[in-house]
Amino acid sequence: MLSIRLALLGPPGVGKGTYSSILSKELRIPHLSTGELLRREISMKTELGREVESYVSRGLLVPDKIVNDIVAKRLCASDCANGFILDGYPRTLPQAVFLEEYFPLDKVVLLQASLETIIERICGRLYCPNCGETYHVSWKPPKRDNICDKCGVKLTRRTDDSPEVVKRRYEEYLATVSPVVDFYKKLGKLVPFRAEGDSQILAYSLLRELSSSRTEILVEK
């Protein structure tokens, strides 16, 4: 049986979700989003979920130990036995060290894009407040300006989808991820990948790149 353990790192708006979803489908392993895992714990009102909510409600970062515990619980599930794709984790060096000790990865993909590209992607996003459909002014525009194709409701933008906020988040990401990148580079597990362009098309290029080194990332169990 083949086992593949991957993590995707990258700044907000680089397309981690799109890449992860396609790789998950093609490799037949679960795509695990840290944000979704945290929200699930909150919605289920678990002990960990209550701890997470106590930090999130105050606008604070959730401590590494709590995030590690939630991720570890999910990775122990039976559907992760043959591999998984982590999206948005590890974010910090302590998280990476924890993961390497208990659930060592085969490869860590570093999705890279310029600040200009990230600003264009994020600031061009449009959302339907009624049905949740998403659009983009450049590559997925609605048929009528600012009107949802599905339900006819006026589209909106997120308040934090501004160039100033995106730039600040991008710089915060670079400062936080740098030790994690160095950690996996030293382990020989880092796969830098230029994510400039159509995420759907590039995801399959990434898949081919990973498959070309399958002897390194696919381990016979």
Predicted regions and their residues:
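Glycine-rich phosphate-binding loop of ATP-dependent small-molecule kinases
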Residues: M1-K221
